[in-house]
Amino acid sequence: ILKGPVLFKNYESELANQLNKQEFKKSMISEDSYYTAYGETTLALKEQIEKAIMEKFNETSDVLDKIDWTDPNNAYLLYAMLKKDFTYSARFEILPAEKFNNSKTQYKYFGINEKSRPEQYSSVKVLFYNNPFDYAVALQGNNDEVILYRTNSDKTFKNLYADLTKKTEKYRGNRAFVQGDKLKIPFISVKQDIDYQALCGHEILNTDRLYIGKALNTVDFNMNNTGVKLKSEAAMSIMTMSLMPEMKKQRGRNFYFNNTFALFLKEKDKSMPYYAMRVKNMELYKYTGEIH
């Protein structure tokens, strides 16, 4: 339906430019973790999507009911769902609450301290530790990993991940998490509904007078001491214009993620992450799930 970058006639969109730069590809994630559909905007397509995501993920949609399926100008629909639910190799300790990035509020944390069991160490792979302000670890699941990169950089996620990869390749220190090392990570919840209204109502270049009627995205993310759950949906309705409106023992390292950091989710056998997040203000990510 739409091939290549989305550009508008007589309208410059910074949001569209940023989205066009994103390089997410299906090859970054296994087929059993996503579902996509597109076609003419009919109730039959809606039923097809609802049945498919229920059978594949046992999930319902948060966006399909926001599409006008009876509007005759609603020509096409593009839809995608990403679903991930995985546990770490071992359950982490629940740590005392403390501040994040000099906040007034205290937040819940999990990780590894001096009382933790040695078997928990294998759930953490050290990517690099250059100094107390520049380090990264990967929490291990069976097929996925959570990469945490301590940095204040405001670069794009693509450039952040490139920096992280270079530092990981150059690191010659101990990649094992060992006795004396400590780990501290905040519990995180994100539930976000985004309506990209700035993309709507403008004629799309190189089409037969089509425009975006709705562009919706939802994210439901939870990370705790046992694992990660992620559900994300995206839907875009395309309308016609007719009715347009190991080493010797070393000093212990503190991998404390209690200040600004970047988070990536990646399948172990893939080279690029399928999800990224920058955590700076914990009030936006305050954990709302249960703690066991």
Each language-model region and where it sits:
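Hydrophobic-core positions in well-structured secondary-structure elements of globular domains
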Residues: I1-H292
